[in-house]
Regions:
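Selective transmembrane helix interface/packing segments
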Residues: 1-387
Length: 387
């Protein structure tokens, strides 16, 4: 009871609330909006089109600005226009749907993706505050557990629509997401064996000391152990990334939507903001998946030879610069890595064709599952012989 009335309790509560608001309203929503915009521009570039390049901001309304610069902003106002469009569209609910579950499904599809971000450390420290909402010991297991709930939203959307196409999309998503969750979990085990922790900040801390798992030379040197572990880590990275594509229903794994076969799959009957929630959930899951890959394999917020937000590590002469500046650098580095991975998601979507359903299951169960399982024993053997 004394803790509840102490200043430490209110400090932790206040900083956690501030980090949550920052993460949702200043990171997730803008990143989702401009990831959609980036996808439309990149797809246009790949297909030799122009893409959205007209919608801007009326800069002439700003006091002191006489010229309208909106045509030169390259369509950067398009996400705002899209948001307004979704808000103003009629929220039509077909008469044949099961209304309770029809309304519940978009929330179940979106919320897990946002909640998983709570365990992601997106920086070291900033002004003495850890840049993670919930620095829990079971961070990786927490992310796997919460992200698995999103399949219920997709299944409910397909079932409650009382329509053949959404139902088929929901059934596909069930088998696909459950199959690839297993592969994704097994792919993460070598990282846990090497780092010795399921706490995400501890995994990043290991990479700060020993070098990124995918690029161990970033600590300034290479040992025999690091060279030997490099092979299973690369295998784990490949299988984990492929599984993440399948978990987020992105091409070439978008069988639950599959526009050429199922119209729009599980969200065929949805419109307006309920459709936008599915959209938001998909892109938030992409951000969470990219962030998890950065944490597990790419050193999290760490940049080689750069101190963290607490003034630890890095080159000695850089410690003369205030630590809060390095805290900002760490946060920027983390989200820059996430942005690069998001571009990879977009690039792959507009490059590779969709798998057939039998090919999807064959890849997951006959290849990725066995490779991830053998890779665990390979990692354990290397750790045992190089101890």
């Amino acid at each position: 009871m004394d803790f509840l009335t102490s200043s430490d309790f209110w400090f932790l509560t206040g900083t956690s609330l501030a980090k949550t608001i920052f993460l949702i309203f200043l990171v997730v929503l803008p990143m989702v909006s401009y990831t959609v915009y980036a996808e439309r521009r990149v797809s246009a570039l790949i297909q030799d089109r122009v893409g959205p390049n007209r919608t801007g901001f009326p800069t002439s309304l700003i006091p002191g600005v006489t010229k309208d610069w909106s045509p030169f902003l390259g369509g950067l106002g398009q996400p705002v226009a899209d948001a307004v469009k979704f808000l103003l569209k009629e929220d039509f609910v077909p008469g044949h749907v099961n209304k309770l579950y029809f309304w519940l499904a978009p929330c179940l599809a979106m919320m897990p993706a946002i909640v998983t971000l709570a365990a992601i450390p997106f920086g070291s420290e900033f002004l003495g505050v850890k840049m993670v909402v919930a620095d829990i010991n079971v961070g990786l297991l927490f992310m796997f557990a919460i992200s698995s709930v999103s399949v219920y939203g997709i299944v409910l959307a397909g079932w409650s629509s009382n329509s053949k196409y959404p139902f088929l999309g929901g059934i596909r998503s069930t088998s696909q997401m459950i199959s690839y969750e297993l592969c994704m979990g097994l792919s993460a085990v070598p990282v846990l064996l090497v780092c010795g922790s399921t706490k995400l900040s501890a995994i990043v801390g290991y990479q700060v000391r020993e070098g990124w798992l995918l690029a161990p030379f970033t600590d300034g040197g290479l040992s025999v152990r690091e060279i030997a572990l490099w092979v299973p880590i690369i295998i784990a990275f490949i299988t984990f990334t492929i599984s993440m594509f399948a978990e987020t229903n992105r091409l070439p794994f978008d069988l639950p939507e599959s526009e050429t076969e199922l119209v729009a799959g599980y969200h065929t009957e949805y419109s307006s903001m309920k459709f936008a929630l599915f959209f938001l959930g998909e892109y938030t899951a992409m951000i969470a998946g990219s962030a998890l890959i950065v944490v597990l394999f790419l050193g999290g917020w760490h940049l080689p030879f750069i101190p963290d937000g607490a003034g630890q590590g890095g080159l000695t002469f850089l410690h003369a610069i205030p630590s809060w500046i390095w805290g900002l650098v760490n946060i920027t580095a983390f989200f820059a890595k996430v942005a690069v991975l998001l571009l990879v998601f977009i690039w792959v979507r507009w490059t590779l064709p969709r798998f057939r359903y039998d090919q999807l299951m064959k890849l997951g169960w006959l290849y990725l599952f066995e490779i991830a399982l053998v890779n665990i024993f390979l990692t354990a053997g290397i750790l045992a012989f190089t101890k």
